């Protein structure tokens, strides 16, 4: 049996009608980037996160890349991450010329093991 890496239709089956309605609204407006619909989303996300700003981007990969850039990550830097993640995590780090430093996960939580972080820091 072939298992897909990402099964988008199955992941949003319950909200399909609402998603299609909103996609049609965006297409009808002719504003695929920026515009009032994106601004409204950004304001709602900022409010929900109790943040001053939120920026809509085209993908999770872009979100990771912009976050790393905002943090000042660049050539030769080391960024601690987990190998138990989507490949864009390490890819975004490497794209900026930085080095992903992998730390294993905790068996109980599947999150990065904080007890291993300090010994991986090199400077």
Which stretches of residues belong to each language-model region?
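Conserved PLP-binding active-site segment in aminotransferase class I/II-type PLP enzymes
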Residues: 1-70, 74, 96
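PLP-dependent aminotransferase-like
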Residues: 69-123
């Amino acid at each position: 049996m072939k298992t897909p890496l990402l099964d988008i239709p199955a992941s949003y089956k319950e909200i399909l009608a609402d998603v299609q309605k909103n996609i049609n609204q965006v297409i009808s407006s002719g504003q695929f980037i920026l515009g009032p619909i994106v601004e409204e989303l950004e304001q709602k996300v900022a409010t929900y996160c109790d943040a001053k700003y939120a920026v809509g981007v085209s993908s999770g990969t872009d979100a990771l890349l912009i976050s790393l850039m905002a943090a000042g990550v660049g050539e030769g830097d080391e960024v601690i991450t987990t190998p138990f993640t989507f490949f864009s995590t390490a890819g975004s780090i490497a794209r900026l010329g930085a080095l992903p430093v992998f730390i294993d996960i905790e068996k109980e939580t599947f999150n990065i093991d904080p007890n291993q972080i300090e010994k991986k820091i090199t400077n």
